[in-house]
């Protein structure tokens, strides 16, 4: 009997150990499973899903956006849809404030009503409702997707539709509808963009054929010089009128009621533009030293200590957080390499100039004057390619910053198109000024409240009498006679 007891106890102990082992193993497996599938811990799945996002790489590919969806089938994307949509809705939804959640509900309601209006044939009302929905929830993929489809099929605005599909995919990479829509529109939009660039080249060549001694062209160049400074400082908040800006540049006299800084901003731009005309336009390569010298002149009268120097503190620009001061030297070296690389110089001049502008303002290397320096660099590159310096009207400031914001979010194309628009309007102005057209060409008719820089230019050009340029004024040099 005693022997039987002894042999029984080890068996019971073995059973107990096995039970404990399987219990612990099962508990651990359950914990790992929940950890991997919970919305708060999606690192392993999220890492792979991030590879499927649409990327814009500020440190490398400035023209192309990398669409990595192209290597995955729709079936594979659908396999991730349920998991990804749930994890995104859980994690993002939890971060919404009560007001934001209310806006999203209202936006979805407006979107559904817009779809009903469209079915009823009331497209005007549908368009207004879609705009309202987008204003309430500009980051909601469903709103972006449905509005894009409405624009594509009913408004025939395939470019804007493609932009919204791109945004929807950036927010929800597993959205197979947005993916399919973008596959349909991407090539068409690229073709339209390429045709636009061909048209710009044709207008540039037509302008280049006009002799530099043409009196009308010289008047247009002089007026554009004043306009360029007026609008560039105006974008940054300078309150000088065009007449006051002209007076400061021509007389060097102070304007009553205006701050010293506002005067100095205008004088700094004048110095920088003369430096471009006298030096940079003729150079084969633009170096980091050239950019620092350009900035030194921009801030030469406002803040000579910071002029031409990298910032030494962290700055914040709206929702954009530029690199820290410790990274600026390396990033600017990379920018210099990109600026002079064979790949960059093979781009169309308008694309190249717009991307250089964006890249520099994205790095934000200076404590002040980043926007003015970036626009001056952009125009330097355009002038080297035979284009006139582009005027970005200060009345379009909100659009300008909106497109920069979209570029920060991953889609550089709207900003490049905006610069192309400004380039075309500037070219049209010069061509109009040197032609025998009795009236304004249609695309130049703008009211001042809409940013009528070209209408203002036309008025001043028409009223100006031919006059010789002063030697060394910075207005008589440049490529193909551009200021």
Curated annotation (Swiss-Prot):
It is found in: Membrane. GO terms for molecular function: AMPylase activity; ATP binding; Hsp70 protein binding; protein adenylylhydrolase activity; protein homodimerization activity. The active site is at 364. It comes from Drosophila grimshawi. The fido domain mediates the adenylyltransferase activity. Protein that can both mediate the addition of adenosine 5'-monophosphate (AMP) to specific residues of target proteins (AMPylation), and the removal of the same modification from target proteins (de-AMPylation), depending on the context. The side chain of Glu-236 determines which of the two opposing activities (AMPylase or de-AMPylase) will take place. Acts as a key regulator of the unfolded protein response (UPR) by mediating AMPylation or de-AMPylation of Hsc70-3/BiP. TPR repeats lie at residues 107-140, 141-175. It holds the Pfam family Fic. This is Protein adenylyltransferase Fic. PROSITE patterns: FIDO, TPR_REGION. The lineage of its organism: Eukaryota, Metazoa, Ecdysozoa, Arthropoda, Hexapoda. It catalyses: L-tyrosyl-[protein] + ATP = O-(5'-adenylyl)-L-tyrosyl-[protein] + diphosphate; L-threonyl-[protein] + ATP = 3-O-(5'-adenylyl)-L-threonyl-[protein] + diphosphate; 3-O-(5'-adenylyl)-L-threonyl-[protein] + H2O = L-threonyl-[protein] + AMP + H(+). Homodimer.
């Amino acid at each position: 009997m005693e022997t039987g007891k002894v042999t029984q106890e080890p068996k019971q102990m073995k059973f107990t150990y096995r039970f404990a082992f399987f219990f612990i193993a099962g508990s651990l497996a359950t914990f790992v499973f929940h950890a991997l599938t919970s919305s708060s811990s999606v690192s392993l799945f999220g890492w792979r899903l991030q590879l499927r996002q649409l990327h814009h790489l500020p440190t490398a590919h400035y023209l192309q956006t990398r669409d990595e969806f192209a290597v995955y089938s729709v079936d594979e994307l659908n396999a991730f849809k349920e998991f990804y949509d749930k994890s995104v809705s859980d994690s993002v939804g939890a971060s919404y404030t009560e007001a934001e959640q209310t806006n999203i509900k209202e936006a979805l309601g407006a979107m559904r009503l817009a779809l009903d209006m469209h079915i009823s044939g009331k497209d005007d009302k549908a368009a207004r409702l879609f705009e309202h929905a987008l204003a309430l929830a500009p980051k909601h993929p469903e709103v972006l997707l449905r509005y894009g489809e409405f624009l594509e099929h009913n408004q025939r605005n395939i470019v804007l539709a493609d932009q919204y599909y791109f945004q929807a995919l950036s927010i929800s990479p597993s959205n197979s509808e947005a993916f399919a829509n973008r596959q349909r529109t991407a090539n068409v939009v690229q073709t339209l963009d390429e045709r636009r660039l061909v048209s710009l080249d044709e207008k540039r060549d037509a302008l280049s054929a006009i002799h530099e001694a043409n009196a009308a062209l010289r008047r247009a160049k002089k007026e554009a010089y004043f306009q360029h400074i007026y609008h560039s400082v105006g974008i940054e908040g300078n309150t000088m009128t065009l007449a006051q800006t002209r007076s400061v540049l021509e007389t060097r006299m102070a304007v009553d009621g205006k701050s010293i800084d506002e005067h100095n901003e205008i004088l700094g731009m004048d110095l920088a533009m003369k430096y471009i005309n006298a030096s940079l336009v003729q150079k084969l390569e633009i170096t980091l030293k050239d950019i620092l010298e350009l900035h030194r002149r921009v801030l030469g009268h406002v803040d000579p200590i910071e002029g031409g120097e990298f910032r030494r503190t962290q700055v914040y620009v709206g929702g954009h957080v530029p690199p820290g001061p410790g990274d600026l030297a390396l990033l600017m070296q990379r920018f210099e390499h990109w600026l002079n690389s064979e790949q960059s110089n093979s781009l169309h001049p308008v694309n190249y100039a717009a991307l250089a502008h964006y890249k520099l303002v994205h790095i934000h290397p200076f404590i002040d004057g980043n926007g003015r320096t970036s626009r001056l660099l952009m125009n330097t590159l355009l002038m080297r390619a035979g284009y006139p310096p582009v005027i970005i009207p200060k009345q379009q400031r909100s659009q300008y910053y909106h497109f920069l914001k979209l570029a920060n979010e991953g889609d550089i194309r709207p900003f490049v198109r905006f610069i192309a628009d400004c380039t075309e309007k500037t070219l049209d102005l010069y061509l109009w000024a040197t032609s025998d057209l009795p009236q304004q060409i249609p695309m130049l008719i703008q009211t001042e409240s809409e940013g009528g820089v070209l209408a203002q230019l036309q008025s001043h050009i028409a009223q100006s009498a031919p006059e010789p340029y002063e030697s060394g004024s910075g207005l008589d040099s440049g490529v193909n006679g551009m200021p």
